[in-house]
Amino acid sequence: MPVNLKGRSFLTLKDFTPDEIRYMLNLAADLKAKKRAGIRGNLLAGKNIVLLFEKTSTRTRCAFEVAAYDEGAHVTFLDSKSSQMGKKETMVDTAKVLGRFFDGIEYRGYDQKVVEGLAANAGVPVWNGLTDVDHPTQALADILTLMENTKKPLNKCKLVFCGDTRNNVAYCLMYICAKLGMHYVGWGPKELAPAADVVAYCKEVAKETGAIVEYGEDRALLKGADALYTDIWASMGEEDKIPERVKQLTPYKVTGEVLAATENSDCIFLHCLPSFHDFDTTMAASQKELSYDIREVTDEVFLSPNSKVFDEAENRMHTIKAVMVATIGNV
């Protein structure tokens, strides 16, 4: 049966079947090939989309804007300073207004309930650009990058997330790996283990797809990985958590030794970015002066041929384009 996602919101990968996820990945690969060939599309011609940002980003904003422009859409950007949502206007009212103006709404912020509320009230597709508990467009880009760098079918691939295994990126990777029958490992300290309800959901899905979902502290879990993944240990505004995070997560830093422990010379390294892989940022340098090394990955890995982080960043644009085309496109 053909996949039809027209009119659907994209809030979490939990809402989509394995076939629907594969459809979006294959569509992204096709759109990427056409862009590389210089074929300009018009699949979003006449469409108006709004980007609603409560939390800043480089990749998400640029990916949505370029993807939309590539296919002929018009884009409006609203941040917390240029929107009254939650201040002088309720989220419900904002959703109803934006739904009258736009064909699709992207939201990037904090609370998953906000993006769900927008989708429930806007009357048009709403796309999750990131919340505190999910980052579904990122997971699509991650898996597309893995597809481009392995000869294995996805259900034979093993992905290991290193570090804080209960953050939003780890969760969206758990969901997509479970849906696609992959082997997911969360390698990190037990005090930062994924929430029980997330694990239970993924293991229930795995019963249908044949996926393996596990987590733990043992370095033996790295063996056979096709991809190692990590994320920063603390974001801006979380400086007070750095001493504790450095103590907890330094044993799970992605180093050359950790990469070698996979025993797979073709294992790729992935990261959602931004990354602290050196001390050339203000935050990393200032923390180094306080004797805290906040690098979650070393340059030995980040700059190695195994690292596909910039291909992965580009793939944000192609997968986001696929989501928009699939849900509001002229197809």
Which functions belong to the PLM regions below?
Residues F101, N121-G123, L180, S265, ...:
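Short, structured coil segments at secondary-structure junctions
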Residues F53-V66, E148-D231:
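Glycine-rich phosphate/diphosphate-binding loop of Rossmann-like nucleotide-binding domains
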Residues E204-T298:
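Rossmann-like adenosine-cofactor binding region
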